[in-house]
C-alpha cells in the first residue's frame, strides 16, 4: 500500500490513546483524540488516509485533510530550513510535509516565512515519503473569478502565489487574480506572503493591478508626522533643513526624498504647525498639536 491512499480497514485492538486497524497484514494507529468523540468496536471497519507520522509510526486519519494526493489547498508554513526547504501544515495529525528547496525561489529572501501560506498538493515518492508540490498557474487559475469595477482604488487582501521577474502574481481572499509590478513593492515580496494592497486598475477581464505603496496623502501624513516628532525632540525645536537644502543631505538626515520633504513641509505649513525661515530651517510653532499625531 502507498501512503496517501484512502483505505478501509478493520479495528483489531485498542489501548487508552489509540485504536489499531489492519489492512493486508499491515497495522495503522488511529489516535482516539482524532475521532471527534466517536467510539469504535473491535472488528468495526473505518475509512481513512494512511501515512507515516513524525514519530515514524504508520497511522490512519479519518478526518480527511483538504490537501492530499490529487487535491489542492492552502497549507501554512510552520518552519523554514535553509538546507531542506519549508515545512507545511496541511491538516495531518502529528505531521508536517516538506516543500523542497528545489521547488522554491533561488533567492532565499523570496522564500515563504513562518505563517505564510502556499497552495499545494501532496506527492508521494518511491520511498513512500510525502513532499509538498506547489500548484502551477493553471491549477490556481481554477480559483479565479472576475473582480467588479467598483474595486478601483479600494484596499484588498491578497496572497502571493507566483513570483516573476517583473513582479508577482497574487490571488485576493475573494478569488480575484492580481498582479503587482516590481516598482510597486516597498520590500522584496515572498512566495506565500499575505499583503494589504491598493487596487490601481481593474482590467476588462476582471483581473487587478495592485500597489503596496501608500496613497499620496497617506505618505505625506507619515512624513509630516516624522518631521513633527523630530522637531519636538530637536534643540529649540529646530531642524536645519529647507527648500534649498541638498537632496542628499535631506535623504541622509530624514531617509526621504527632497520631493517628499517639500510635500510634508507644505502640509505642515498649511496646518500652521511649523514655520519656515528662508534658507535657515524649520521651527515647531504649536507643540500642543503634536500630541494629536501620535
Predicted regions and their residues:
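Single-stranded RNA-binding regions, centering on S1/OB-family and related RNA-binding modules
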Residues: 1-294
Amino acid at each position: 500500500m502507498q501512503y496517501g491512499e484512502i483505505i478501509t480497514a478493520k479495528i483489531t485492538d485498542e489501548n487508552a490513546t489509540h485504536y489499531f486497524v489492519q489492512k493486508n497484514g499491515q497495522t495503522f494507529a488511529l489516535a482516539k483524540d482524532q475521532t471527534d468523540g466517536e467510539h469504535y468496536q473491535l472488528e468495526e471497519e473505518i475509512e481513512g488516509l494512511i501515512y507515516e507520522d513524525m514519530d515514524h509510526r504508520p497511522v490512519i486519519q479519518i478526518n480527511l485533510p483538504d490537501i492530499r494526493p490529487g487535491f489542492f489547498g492552502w497549507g501554512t508554513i510552520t518552519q523554514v530550513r535553509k538546507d531542506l526547504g519549508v515545512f507545511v501544515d496541511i491538516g495531518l495529525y502529528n505531521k508536517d510535509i516538506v516543500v523542497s528547496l528545489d521547488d522554491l525561489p533561488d533567492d532565499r529572501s523570496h522564500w515563504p516565512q513562518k505563517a505564510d501560506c502556499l497552495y499545494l498538493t501532496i506527492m508521494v515518492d518511491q520511498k513512500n515519503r510525502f513532499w509538498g508540490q506547489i500548484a502551477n498557474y493553471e491549477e490556481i487559475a481554477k480559483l479565479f473569478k472576475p473582480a467588479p469595477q467598483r474595486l478601483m482604488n479600494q484596499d484588498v487582501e491578497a496572497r502571493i502565489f507566483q513570483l516573476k521577474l517583473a513582479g508577482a502574481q497574487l490571488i485576493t481572499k475573494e478569488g480575484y487574480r492580481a498582479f503587482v509590478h516590481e516598482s510597486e513593492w516597498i520590500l522584496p515580496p515572498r512566495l506565500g506572503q499575505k499583503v494589504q494592497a491598493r487596487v490601481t486598475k481593474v482590467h476588462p477581464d476582471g483581473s487587478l493591478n495592485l500597489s503596496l505603496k501608500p496613497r499620496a496623502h497617506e505618505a505625506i501624513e507619515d512624513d509630516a508626522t516624522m518631521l513633527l516628532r523630530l522637531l519636538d525632540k530637536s534643540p529649540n525645536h529646530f531642524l536645519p533643513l529647507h527648500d534649498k537644502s541638498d537632496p542628499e543631505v535631506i535623504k541622509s538626515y530624514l531617509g526621504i526624498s527632497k520631493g517628499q520633504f517639500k510635500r510634508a513641509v507644505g502640509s505642515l505649513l498649511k496646518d500652521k504647525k511649523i514655520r519656515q525661515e528662508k534658507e535657515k530651517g524649520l521651527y515647531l510653532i504649536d507643540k500642543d498639536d503634536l500630541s494629536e499625531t501620535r
